[in-house]
Regions:
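N-terminal Rossmann-like dinucleotide-binding module
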Residues: 1-31
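N-terminal glycine-/serine-/threonine-rich beta1-alpha1-beta2 phosphate-ribose binding loop
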Residues: 23-71
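Donor/substrate-binding cores of folate-linked one-carbon enzymes
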Residues: 13, 72-172
Length: 172
């Protein structure tokens, strides 16, 4: 899971992660067994509070997030946030995106880079604003796309590179 690598990096490097927001548990598979996200399972194993809102503008969720008093919010592989959420922390909210923005904004940037025959891609951290993947860029790291690369192998490379960039961004 792309987001899990960044969360693990933050925890393993002793950052004070005051909470995690992840997707709500949902039924999947033949038996429609309730599936919990890897981010939720990891956070719970580390004693980190987990919020799983259905609607991000829900007053109960927003109040619970405010109660955590985050100084900074980091978004990885999640949906677009409403302004009431991304404006909350003192130092803002930044996102990790799996492309060299402004290229490949939006969904499936890894797939599109391969489909379009790009020779390189990378990861970007940027401050969230009103539009999708348009905020001020904080940092970028480039990685080559090898001729044998698949979306899966590139995903895994960018996941590791992205977690490292999240740490560099928090430290800057």
């Amino acid at each position: 899971d792309f987001a899990l690598a960044s969360l693990k990096a933050l925890v393993e490097n002793h950052y004070n992660v005051v909470g995690v927001v992840t997707v709500a548990d949902k039924p999947s598979g033949r038996g429609q067994k309730l599936h919990e996200s890897p981010v939720k399972l990891y956070a719970e194993s580390k004693g980190i509070p987990v919020l799983q809102p259905i609607k991000l503008k829900d007053e109960t969720f927003v109040n619970a997030l405010k109660a955590l008093q985050p100084d900074l919010q980091i978004v990885v592989a999640f949906r677009m946030l409403p302004e009431v959420v991304w404006r909350l922390p003192k130092y803002g909210t930044f996102n990790l995106h799996a492309s060299l923005l402004p290229n490949y904004r939006g969904a499936a940037p890894i797939n599109w880079a391969i489909i379009n025959g790009e020779k390189e891609t990378g990861v970007t951290t940027f401050f969230i604003d009103e539009k999708i993947d348009t905020g001020a860029i904080i940092a970028q790291e480039v990685t080559p796309i090898e001729s044998h690369e698949t979306a899966g192998t590139l995903h895994d490379k960018l996941m590791v590179q992205g977690a490292e960039l999240v740490l560099k961004t928090v430290d800057s």
